[in-house]
């Protein structure tokens, strides 16, 4: 199977800026990762397992043509596999029922008939395929622990009034969660993503870091020495594209 290397799969400091308008593939992946996130929440998954499921999904389609397999089957298998990787094990029956209700709101759970067992077997077989395609490399370093550390540090820098009157922390976490709609988790380092969402959250509310003008280097470089402004700009640009798709896709 010929591998595909879309922009969202490129990694490293020199990752290219996103195009002005999201590619059709990006819109498809947006829909499917939105399903992963919503299904994950209904299944009671924590933020890290959901992030892992999205990353597995994105990484798989960096190796496989978009039309080679059913996207939502891959998504369900990504959820199932992520639960194992992050030790939040999920039953295939629950994944199937949540997915069924996602596409058929108000419907009853599927009967344990041949259709159910065929779907269950498909999820398990797809999981094995994904493990082989990804060469069993399904553990990832996520930005969450870095963002938590950076938020604690920033809270100590800012005055109490600035911190309490603006939802910087809530916004940064929301930006990080939404970044998994795209391939940012593959294109950029975890530390860089964590700093960039914090940078954007501060920009949104017009909050300035104290003594920024007198410091030898910007606050964001204190958190990550190899981070540059162009990398931050690239991440912010990709995030803006994600929110643009969110307004355009029903």
UniProtKB/Swiss-Prot annotation:
- Superkingdom, taxonomy of origin: Eukaryota
Matches recorded under InterPro entries? Cyclin-like_dom (IPR013763), Cyclin-like_sf (IPR036915), Cyclin-Q_first_cyclin_box (IPR048055), Cyclin-Q_second_cyclin_box (IPR048053), Cyclin/Ssn8 (IPR043198), Cyclin_N (IPR006671)
What's a Gene Ontology MF term here?
protein kinase activator activity
Organism this protein belongs to: Mus musculus
Tell me the function of this protein: Activating cyclin for the cyclin-associated kinase CDK10.
> Which family is this protein grouped under?
Belongs to the cyclin family. Cyclin-like FAM58 subfamily.
Return the annotated region ranges for Disordered: 1-23
An individual GO BP term: regulation of cell cycle G2/M phase transition
- Record's GO cellular component terms: cyclin-dependent protein kinase holoenzyme complex
UniProt cross-references to Pfam families, sorted A to Z: Cyclin_N
Acetylation as a keyword? Answer: yes
Q: How does it assemble?
A: Associates with CDK10 to promote its kinase activity.
UniProt entry keywords in alphabetical sequence: Acetylation, Cyclin
Give the N-acetylmethionine positions (modified residues): 1
Gene name in the database record: Ccnq
> What is the protein named?
Cyclin-Q
């Amino acid at each position: 199977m010929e591998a595909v290397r879309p922009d969202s799969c490129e990694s490293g400091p020199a990752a290219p800026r996103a195009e002005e308008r999201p590619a059709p593939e990006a819109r498809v992946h947006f829909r499917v990762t939105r399903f992963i996130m919503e299904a994950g929440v209904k299944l009671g998954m924590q933020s890290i397992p959901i992030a892992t499921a999205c990353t597995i999904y994105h990484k798989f389609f960096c190796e496989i043509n978009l039309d080679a397999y059913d996207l939502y089957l891959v998504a369900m298998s990504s959820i199932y596999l992520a639960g194992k990787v992050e030790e939040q094990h999920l039953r295939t029956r629950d994944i199937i029922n949540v997915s069924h209700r996602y596409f058929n709101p108000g419907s009853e759970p599927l009967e344990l008939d041949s259709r159910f067992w065929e779907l269950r077997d498909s999820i398990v077989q797809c999981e094995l395929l994904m493990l082989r395609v990804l060469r069993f490399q399904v553990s990832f370093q996520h930005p969450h622990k870095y963002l938590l550390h950076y938020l604690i540090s920033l809270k100590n820098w800012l005055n109490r009034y600035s911190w309490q009157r603006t939802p910087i922390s809530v916004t940064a976490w929301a930006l990080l969660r939404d970044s998994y709609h795209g391939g940012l988790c593959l294109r950029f380092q975890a530390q860089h993503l964590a700093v960039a969402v914090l940078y954007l959250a501060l920009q949104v509310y017009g909050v300035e870091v104290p003594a920024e003008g007198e410091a030898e280097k910007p606050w964001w470089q204190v958190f990550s020495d190899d981070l540059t402004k162009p990398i931050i700009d690239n991440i912010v640009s990709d995030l803006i594209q994600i929110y643009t798709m969110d307004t355009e896709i029903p």
